[in-house]
Structures are given as structure tokens and as C-alpha cells.
A protein has these predicted regions:
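A short mid-domain helix/strand-loop element embedded in enzyme catalytic domains
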Residues: 1-41
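Poly-acidic low-complexity segments
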Residues: 9, 56, 64, 124-129
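Conserved catalytic cores of phosphodiester-cleaving nucleases, focusing on short active-site segments
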Residues: 28, 32, 61-65, 73-81
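A short acidic/basic microdomain associated with nuclease active sites
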Residues: 35-66
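Active/binding-pocket-proximal capping segment
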Residues: 39, 46-47, 69, 74, ...
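Active-site lining segments that contact anionic ligands and/or coordinate catalytic metals
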Residues: 58-60, 70-72, 85, 102-105
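Catalytic cores of nucleic-acid endonucleases
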Residues: 77-128
Length: 129
């Protein structure tokens, strides 16, 4: 067997992943606002925040939203172009925030994003999924 050398653009891959993640977060932000507005909760829709863009990474979630009943939702968005079981990275901080906010934290999983986006949500504890 012979090894084949090839160049791998790590910076390009990282930029594509960041762009994909940002697009997924933006889609979830609009989705959350639309759900609240359609439930007659424009007051809450106006309070939905894109935390990772406004405050930066490190909060352990990307979107701060609400249920139509007014309960807090802390949403971590994970987006891939592959199928629903495509691996994705979740940080120790995200896992810790999920564990300490089990009632409000949710992972919003977007997959097949560039073709026909699909989604599902996972709630803590994540090790059961």
C-alpha cells in the first residue's frame, strides 16, 4: 500500500464550519421568534437573543429564547450538512451548562442543512441519547 500526500486546508475547513454554524444559529433564531409570534407572544419574540453573536462564545448556548408560556429556553445549535447521525463537536462547557440547566437547556440539531434542512431537539442528560 502506498501513501498519498495531499494538502489539507485546515483554515478553510474551519471557516466553512463557522459559516455553517452561524447560518444554523440564524435559522433557529428566526424560528424561535416566529414560533413565539405565531403563539401571540410578540413580547417574548422581541426578547429572543443571539447570545453567541451578541456576547461571544462561552455561555454554553447560542440562543436565549422562551416557550410560549414564558419559560426560559437556552438553545445550543449544532448544524451539519450530513445526515442526522453525522458527528459534531460539543464542548465540556456546553455539557456542563446543559447539566446545570436541565430544565431550560436544549440542543437544537440541524442536519442536511445545505439541501433540505431537518431538525430535532435533545434535552439533558445528553449521555442518554
Amino acid at each position: 500500500m502506498q501513501a498519498v500526500a495531499r494538502k489539507f486546508d485546515v483554515a478553510g475547513r474551519d471557516e466553512r464550519n463557522r459559516s455553517l454554524g452561524k447560518a444554523g444559529e440564524e435559522r433557529v433564531l428566526h424560528h424561535e421568534r416566529a414560533i413565539l409570534a405565531s403563539a401571540g407572544r410578540q413580547d417574548l419574540a422581541r426578547k429572543v437573543r443571539w447570545v453567541s453573536q451578541e456576547d461571544g462564545d462561552g455561555a454554553g448556548y447560542d440562543i436565549s429564547s422562551f416557550s410560549p408560556e414564558g419559560e426560559e429556553r437556552l438553545i445550543e445549535v449544532k448544524t451539519t450538512n450530513g445526515w442526522e447521525r453525522t458527528p459534531f463537536h460539543i464542548s465540556r462547557n456546553e455539557l456542563a451548562v446543559a447539566d446545570s440547566n436541565r430544565d431550560s437547556w436544549t440542543l437544537f440539531r440541524l442536519w442536511n442543512f445545505s439541501r433540505e434542512p431537518r431538525a430535532f431537539e435533545l434535552r439533558p442528560p445528553l449521555n442518554t441519547h
